[in-house]
Amino acid sequence: EIGAVNPTALEGLTDQTDWFDEVYKTGQTQNYQVSVSNGNEKMKYFLSAGYLDEKGILEGTYFKRYSFRANIDNQIRSWLNVSANISYSDNIGNTGIISGTGANRGGVVLSVINTPTYAPIWDPEKPNQYNKNFYGVNIMNPMENLARQKNNKNKENRLIASLSLIH
């Protein structure tokens, strides 16, 4: 019969996983800065260093930065001023977000929203394997999605310097 509803088709499909609680956690940020400056009418300097450590709200996500900056301004002659600026930063992080395809195109964030709450994290028939049977729903298990992305690291070193002579 077309349009008929089978009331027993969804038996056993009770809420068992709160995907938001499983995937999201409290983030944490530590940020430290120190600087020193001094000078007189002939020479001035400024030095600073910093450290930033952020642990993200998704498991395994983070961002760390070490930074250094130096500015020196020197009046060598009444007609010549020399300035030098240098800044360096070392950044490393893992955003934990890689876009998938199809129903997984939003990565972890959308899979948390779209994965049914009746789906268990682990496959009941295959211990230590993530559950992939969502009764016809084509979505990657959010926990598996996170596990696959934990080594998605980005590393960047930046050095910016300038020198100026002003006559």
Regions found by a protein language model. Name each.
Residues 16-27:
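Periplasmic N-terminal accessory/gating domains of Gram-negative outer-membrane beta-barrel systems
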Residues 25-41, 50, 144-166:
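Outer-membrane beta-barrel transmembrane strands
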Residues 17, 42-49:
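Transmembrane beta-strand segments of Gram-negative outer membrane beta-barrel proteins
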